[in-house]
Amino acid sequence: MYYELSKHKMITCFSKHYDVSEYPEDLNREYYMISTGINENDWKKLVSVMKKLHAKFICVDVANGYMKKLVEFVKRVRASWPDVVIVCGNVVSREMVEELIINGGADIVKVGIGSGSVCTTRIQTGVGMPQLSAVAECSDAAHGIDGAIISDGGITCPGDVAKAFGGGADFVMLGSMLAGHTESAGEVIEENGEKYKVFYGMSSSTAMNKYHGGVANYRSSEGKTVKLKYKGSVENTVMDILGGVRSTCTYIGANRVKDIPKCCTFMRVNRQVNTIHNGKEV
């Protein structure tokens, strides 16, 4: 996936479950970020990975960013590698964005709780915030203190990418839109003549069984595992996304992505698209 996305100057965020030996040697540091959790074993692995790669971007990745331990870990990363770009999250409110940037030393905050397509956090816990509202609030906070945000979750089509930029996001993270392709992780499976790929959330029982030896008896799964129709090469999807955002810019008069928030207006609607001929495509 990295090799295909980097052709379009898109950044690949490697999973924090990657072992040191799994990282290729020929990575362009402009187009990938390594990820880490916040426990001591995560720190030891991060040190080993940085010795091998000297990465430009480090993503401190936890489902619940409202922890003092996250802020302290980000401080530790900043002290050890003063020149790296630190990404951390996830959060959905102004106060925590300011805490992570001002006191933690983060450069970019990842925004989104419960909005992912294979996330069930809002069902299991009742916790979350509508993604566009979170992006608008958090980007306003970050930009006021020379920081940036990534909108993480809730993207279903190229138009959603454009809306995330319109809400103030500096970056947009994609999961399900890039799943199910040749370059995506997992084997292609065939059933009744149709090809599929399995896609699962990182808080699902599938992920916890794979990486943590099962779901701990004090918690529940907060993700699901789904079977997606095989989509072929990711190149087609990437070109569709980029083409959609370019067209957004022409419709609203934005000369560049950075101008989208200044050129767009959001309106609340009951129906976004006309669906009268859905299912009749040829």
Regions found by a protein language model. Name each.
Residues M1-A148, S176-H181:
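Active-site entrance/lid segments in N-terminal catalytic domains of soluble metabolic enzymes
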